[in-house]
């Protein structure tokens, strides 16, 4: 969808550097390992396309994104364990250097979250950042073989999907 917006704005006569720095993206997270690199892949693809295809400046090449932990991964049975699932997804997002994060409440699988469950969801982020100290450290996963390999594999799969979409006329044509 991001490139669809880019093409639309360009067709209206705007220059890439006038709008691209203001774009931001929203991704859902999950528990599968591929979610550990979603931001890396998106940033790599975005930067390359903005630089090479659209001739955008450095600022336009910087992708900003928000992550929301996945409601799909929350279980209706034994909902008390959903905090663990959400914590793992939050760690993926933070290790992947997301710009902002929403952690789902453990009871969202069965109801509108209570005030107490929302407080617990917020506490997940606070504990990760303050007590674990991730906000003060560089990403320890950067350069790890599995992360680099996963990034390459996921990027390849995403680019193949982009090609399939383009063959069908882009996002709008595929709809």
Where is each model-derived feature located?
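Helix-rich catalytic cores of soluble enzyme domains
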Residues: 1-92, 105-122
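Charged/polar positions within long, soluble alpha-helices
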Residues: 7-11, 51, 93, 129, ...
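Active-site or pore-adjacent capping/gating segments
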Residues: 88, 99-175
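Metal- or metallocofactor-binding catalytic centers and their adjacent structured scaffolds
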Residues: 96
């Amino acid at each position: 969808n991001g490139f669809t917006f880019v093409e639309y704005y360009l067709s209206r006569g705007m220059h890439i550097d006038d709008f691209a720095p203001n774009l931001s993206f929203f991704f859902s997270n999950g528990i599968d390992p591929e979610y550990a690199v979603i931001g890396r892949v998106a940033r790599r693809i975005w930067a390359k396309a903005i630089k090479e295809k659209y001739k955008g400046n450095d600022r336009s090449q910087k992708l900003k994104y928000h992550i929301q932990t996945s409601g799909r991964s929350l279980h209706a049975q034994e909902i008390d364990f959903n905090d663990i699932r959400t914590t793992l997804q939050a760690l993926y997002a933070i290790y992947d250097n997301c710009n902002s994060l929403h952690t789902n409440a453990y009871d969202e699988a069965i109801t509108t979250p209570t005030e107490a469950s929302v407080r617990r969801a917020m506490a997940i982020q606070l504990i990760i950042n303050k007590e674990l100290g991730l906000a003060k450290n560089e990403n320890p996963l950067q350069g790890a073989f599995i992360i680099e390999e996963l990034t390459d594999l996921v990027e390849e799969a995403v680019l193949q999907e982009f090609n399939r979409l383009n063959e069908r006329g882009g996002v709008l044509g595929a709809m």
